[in-house]
Amino acid sequence: MAFTYSDLITQIRNYAELDSNGLSDSTISVIVQNTENRIYREINIDAYKVYASAVTVAGTSTISVPSGLRNIRYVQLVDSTGNVANLLEKDSAYLAEYIENPSSTSLRAEPKYWANFNATTWFVVPVPNTAYTINIAYYSQPTSITTGTSSTSTTYISTYAQDLLLYGSLV
């Protein structure tokens, strides 16, 4: 049986032996969101595996990161003949040292490395000499049970691991 958010609120208050005056809905919401975030940091759940693709532009070292990305599984490059190679993750400082002059056309080649630039952009180096497909496998950030209607809102965790969600919220 799946826990709805309403069920979870009731169970937390019952275990804590407090009513809504002692443990408000907003406080429970924060507790539950923190619990969910800890679960998702420590456990990669197959239900949240996602795949995305991006295409590089010759002479441009940046690509857009998929929204909702939480944890990278792998990043692959596919060339025009269908050959697949894994890109290695490096720190952005390494990429800056690897290619000191990104505008130099003589240094353009098939990318080997990627690094985070910010929440929406990655760098790849060497700077691509042509268009390549970048396949990204990752775990997405699930929607919190607290964001829905309390009487009907459920999540994968509240359906298949309701004890984990409840006891995590009580700790």
Predicted segments, located by residue:
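Glycine-enriched, solvent-exposed interface loops adjoining structured elements
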Residues: 1-171
